[in-house]
Swiss-Prot record:
InterPro entries: MJ1316, UPF0248. This is UPF0248 protein MmarC5_1387. Belongs to the UPF0248 family.
Amino acid sequence: MLKELINKLLWHPDYNSEDYLIKYLHRGAENDEKSVPLKNIVIEDSFLVFDETHIPFHRILEIVNLKNGEILYKKR
C-alpha cells in the first residue's frame, strides 16, 4: 500500500511530487526523525533512495501534503 501511494504521488498527473514531504525514522537525528521532499526520492525494491541515503519502507513515519497539511500516510 505504501509503495503504491508513493508511486501514485510521483507519477500520476493529478499530483505534484513537490507538494509532499516524507518523514522517516533516523536514529540519532533530532527526535529520531528526518524529512525529505518526495520530489527527491527514487523508489527501489524495498526502500527509497535520497542522495546516497537508503530509507527502508518500514522506517517511513508520515507522508504529508505541504499545501494543506493533510497526512496521507501515518505509521501506526
